[in-house]
Amino acid sequence: MSFVPVNPRPFLQDLVNSFVTIRLKWGETEYVGRLVSIDSYMNIQLSDTKEYINRKFTGALGQVLIRCNNVLYIKKADEAETSGDVKMEE
């Protein structure tokens, strides 16, 4: 199995106007919101943003700007995350 490096810019440009989940490097913080824009430094602007800490909803934030060096990963949000439904843990 070999590793093939991929340029993240086309992936991120395809996600503009889609709901994404962004995990921060620090702690267990995640943001779910609509990706509005991404600049050449990969700073990220989200709208309709919701904050989750330890997978628990902590509040709606609205417009958010996330500096590039704080991001651990970005993924397309699934239906449960965008609808506001939160999975209950036992």
Curated annotation (Swiss-Prot):
- The Sm domain sits at 7-80
Domain of life (superkingdom): Eukaryota
Q: Kindly list the places in or outside the cell where this protein is found, as annotated in its UniProt entry.
A: Nucleus; Cytoplasm
Q: Does the keyword Manganese apply?
A: no
Q: GO: which molecular function terms? A: poly(U) RNA binding; RNA binding; splicing factor binding
Recorded hits in Pfam families, A to Z, give: LSM
SMART domains given in the database record: Sm
Example GO biological process term?
mRNA splicing, via spliceosome
The alphabetized UniProt keywords are:
Cytoplasm, mRNA processing, mRNA splicing, Nucleus, Ribonucleoprotein, RNA-binding, Spliceosome
Keyword Mitochondrion on entry: no
A GO CC term?
Answer: U4 snRNP
Q: What does this protein do?
A: Plays a role in pre-mRNA splicing as a core component of the spliceosomal U1, U2, U4 and U5 small nuclear ribonucleoproteins (snRNPs), the building blocks of the spliceosome.
Family designation: Belongs to the snRNP Sm proteins family. SmF/LSm6 subfamily.
What protein does this entry describe?
Answer: Probable small nuclear ribonucleoprotein F
Name the source organism: Neurospora crassa (strain ATCC 24698 / 74-OR23-1A / CBS 708.71 / DSM 1257 / FGSC 987)
User: What lineage, starting at the top, does this entry show?
Assistant: Eukaryota, Fungi, Dikarya, Ascomycota, Pezizomycotina
